[in-house]
Amino acid sequence: MVDITFKQGNVLCGAPVDASHVEQALGGTPEPTLRTACHLDVIISNPPYISEKSYGNGTTARSVRMFEPRIALVPPVIGDALKPPLHQQEDIFYYHILSLSFKMRVKLVILECGDHSQGERVASLCRALAAQYSQVDDLCISIWPANDATVNDSAREVSEPCMVIVQRSGLGNDSACDQPHH
């Protein structure tokens, strides 16, 4: 039997991405297992991903703006020390989450994105970070649902939320690069 532990934390807490940063991001009070050898298998995240512009110009549904706190929707503007080389401010969390996943060699990362355009940016960012961390050959990066997926015989809207799925192969996950089934 395998123990499963769920933790939440702040990847923008300002510390470098390493095991001690993970401890800080996961609440500052490390579990005994984290003190000796920090190990993560899965990261699942639905970070704030709506741009300031989309939030303010009515692109974001009124029901979302009325019932979700702004901090859950729009990423904060952060100082230059933590600011990665991104084209879109709303992608800030993805950079830090993916960097953490590469440093910790996480087996599976699932990230919700606002639409396929953002999903493509996140997948591209993931490929760039994989090259930076020399882990290109280990990964399968996919966007689900795929742009060509159909729902009730009609094309899925590319403006709907999607998931970027990053799977590491060679770690007991031989089917890592199988495409998601619909």
PLM segments and residue spans:
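Glycine/Thr-rich phosphate-binding loops of Rossmann-like dinucleotide-binding domains
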Residues: 15, 53-54, 119
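Conserved Class I SAM-dependent methyltransferase catalytic core
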Residues: 76-151, 157-168
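Short, glycine/acidic-enriched loop or turn micro-motifs at the edges of active sites
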Residues: 13, 49, 115
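Mobile active-site "lid"/loop adjacent to the S-adenosyl-L-methionine
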Residues: 47-92
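Flexible, glycine-/basic-rich loop-and-beta segments that form/coincide
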Residues: 167-182
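A short glycine-rich, Lys/Arg-flanked "PGG" loop and its adjoining helix->strand segment in the class I
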Residues: 35-37, 61-71, 94-105
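Glycine-rich, phosphate-binding/catalytic loops in enzymes
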Residues: 23-25, 59-66, 127-129
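S-adenosyl-L-methionine
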Residues: 1-45
